[in-house]
Amino acid sequence: MHAESVAEQFDNRKYLAIMAEKTLGKIDFVNLCISEFAWKYKLSMPVSYRYLQKYDGIGFLDRNYEAEHILPLQETLKTLRQVCQQNGGTL
């Protein structure tokens, strides 16, 4: 088993971001957002999930899926951060 290079990891992330901008199911989209939020803010997946759950980020994604899943992923991550901050989050 070998570790992925940084370039391979970036390519995988880029592919996932492109897929997110296409039609994904709600569960897939929420999972992708949790993963990308974790990566962007250097959190583990469980910590990212708990943070987004506690400060209504996941609720926001659930309520606004129809609009959010067609926006660029970076915009959704920015909005998630803002929603969480409005609800007491400190990232």
Question: What residue ranges belong to the model's regions?
Answer:
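Intrinsically disordered, low-complexity segments enriched in small/polar residues
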Residues: 1, 23, 55, 86-87
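N-terminal acidic leader/helix
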Residues: 13-45
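Residue-level detector of well-ordered alpha-helical segments, enriched
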Residues: 29, 47, 76-79
